Amino acid sequence: ITATRILKRSIDARQRTIFVNLKVRAYIREMPKDDEYEHTIYNKVEGKPQVIVVGAGPGGLFAALRLIELGLRPVVIERGKDVRERKKDLAQISREHTVDPESNYSFGEGGAGAYSDGKLYTRSKKRGNIDKILNVFCQHGASTAILVDAHPHIGTDKLPRVIENMRNTIIECGGEVHFQTRMEALIIENDEVKGIETNTGKTFLGPVILATGHSARDVYRWLAANNVTIEAKGIAVGVR
């Protein structure tokens, strides 16, 4: 054996004796690659067809990065503020008990999870390429420990920097990110979405991805009022 690499790490603390469980890959007469994670290549997309992404939470940010991979130019529209300015508004909630309806725990860059500890859990094994998601986080500044920990955790103190780096990648590749810009309506012609109208008076044209999370009730009310088909997500409820 010439080298080893940890693939998965977990802690079993159910008994008095604590066990650290490791899943390890052994290399025989060869060495592992130097890179601890896989790098995704993001090429320039200036002048490419644009796609409007409404919401700069995890869904919106990852959608924008995926669009760049596919050679499309993302234009991200976020009703709240950037992740650093948003932190000031969260402090106001605690100190002054005042809530900015557009910049709070639900709205703003990073989404509802940006300031809720940064845990990265999923119980499902069928939700796509989870390893790639973790690699993208590492590429933008997260600790490589999340690649092996059974319960990966970025941390609230580190997550804002990771989110900023993801935004910078989008902009450096030729995409756009617009803060304090709220979608007011979809532009629909002949039953086809052509773009969006915003509270700033500016319209953005192109195919639209709604990554609006669970708190943007105004969006869902507009969709329902304009006969756009919407479906409730199914939920599994356990019974004892």
Where are the language model's segments positioned?
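Residues forming the flavin
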Residues: I1-V20, V24-R240
